[in-house]
Design a protein with these regions (language model features):
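Glycan-recognition and catalytic cores of secretory/periplasmic carbohydrate-active enzymes
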Residues: 1-395
Length: 395
């Protein structure tokens, strides 16, 4: 048995950091964007701007938490690509994706994507003090507030010129959503990162408005879950429980709310976050230590998805830190970590984590190792948060 923070250090040193360092594209900038299940790297695969932002965040945060200056050039490499290629200098905002050599591939603008750039740029600024990174983050904050909102909250998908378009990218399960829980969560996260870097009262005000929506519109107290997809008036479009997003929100919104330092607000949001974490513990945690993906109209999707496992470790640790008497949260965090080590980690030479496992426990060979959504953000952040928190958990 070892302390989970030490296990996290080992995971970073032995697997995550070497893997993502090796994807640096020295010739065309940024990081390679696609590797198939068999670990074949496609050097001409698309480069998702979300993936690049998440890599920038990962190396920036890792350099800070591990106090390892050797990681700064990897963060800078992602930063240069974001600044020079991902940003649209004509219309503002960040493109959805680029070609392998840095030309716009999908030039649409999505609120979710802008938020991740803010999150990454804020971390890079905190690491380096680079004023330009902070200015870019502030510009994207202003852009979201000006171009991606209406009186009810945040909208989702836009053309390059910021004309509204349909939200295919963040809609799933056969619905077309005008608002999503997922985008709201990550706008809050990006703003929290910017607030951590600036203590800007404007950013704090936007965060508080998001928390009002979270508490009043997203959270469903009767079902102990977040609703996922909405029309413009926040009517839920589908009976869906996203176990991964619920456990992620339970710690991430808790963290961001804590930055604001408002006692009453913290108390109100903490009650919601604890309810979400408890519901995942009761309904989604499996006897083998895994957490299933989601439940749509009463039917459970039993895939074990990489990011859901990572967020579950962190969500259960956070819930136990808030409620030390509830040792079942502490035990659950250890169980999920052990499941990750046994099943989700891809132990092949040059492997990282499998995208997901089928219900029979075999890796899904259709899912690649790297693609625009498969990134070091969830598993890397889990490790870095475990090191930062150093909870009394052994695995």
């Amino acid at each position: 048995m070892e302390r989970i923070s030490q296990a996290a250090r080992n995971m970073l040193a032995d697997r995550l950091l070497p893997f993502w360092k090796a994807l640096r594209d020295e010739e065309n900038g940024g990081y390679y964007g696609y590797m198939d299940f068999d670990l074949n790297l496609d050097k001409k695969g698309e480069k998702g701007c979300i993936l690049n932002s998440r890599i920038l965040w990962f190396f920036s945060q890792a350099a800070m938490v591990l106090q390892d200056d050797s990681l700064i050039p990897y963060a800078r490499h992602a930063y240069d690509f974001l600044r020079e290629k991902c940003l649209d200098r004509e219309y503002g905002g960040v493109f959805w994706s680029l070609t392998w050599d840095g030309k716009p591939l999908d030039d649409s603008k999505h609120t979710y994507n802008q938020a991740f750039a803010i999150y990454a740029l804020s971390a890079y600024y905190r690491l380096t003090g680079e004023r330009e990174a902070l200015e870019l983050a502030r510009e994207l904050f202003v852009l979201i507030e000006k171009k991606c909102t209406d009186k009810g909250g945040y909208l989702e998908a836009f053309s390059r010129e910021f004309a509204p378009v349909s939200n295919e990218k963040l809609s799933e399960n056969g619905v077309m959503a005008e608002r999503t829980m997922n985008t709201l969560l990550h706008v809050f996260e990006g703003y929290a990162g910017l607030y951590q870097a600036t203590n800007d009262p404007q950013v704090a005000g936007a965060m508080e408005r998001i928390l009002d929506i979270y508490a009043a519109k997203i959270y469903n107290p009767e079902l102990h879950r977040q609703e996922v997809f909405f029309d413009r008036d926040y009517n839920s479009l589908i009976d869906l429980t996203s176990y991964g997003h619920d456990i992620e929100s339970s710690w991430l919104i808790d963290w961001g709310t804590g930055l604001l330092g408002r006692a009453e607000l913290t108390k109100k949001i903490a009650a919601i976050d604890s309810d979400l974490a408890g519901h995942i513990l009761r309904t989604a945690l499996q006897p083998d230590g895994s957490v299933v993906n989601e439940c749509e109209r009463g039917v459970v999707d039993e895939h074990r998805v990489w990011w859901v496992q990572a967020e579950s470790v962190l969500g259960f640790v956070n819930a136990w830190e808030k409620h030390p008497e509830r040792v079942e949260f502490r035990e659950a965090a250890a169980w999920v970590w052990q499941y990750i080590q046994k099943k989700i980690v891809d132990s092949r030479p040059g492997g990282e984590w499998f995208w997901r496992l089928n219900s029979d426990g075999t890796p899904d060979r259709e899912k690649p190792t790297v693609e625009p959504w498969k990134c070091p953000y969830h598993n890397g952040r889990m490790c870095l948060e475990l090191i930062r928190r150093d909870p009394d958990v052994y695995v």
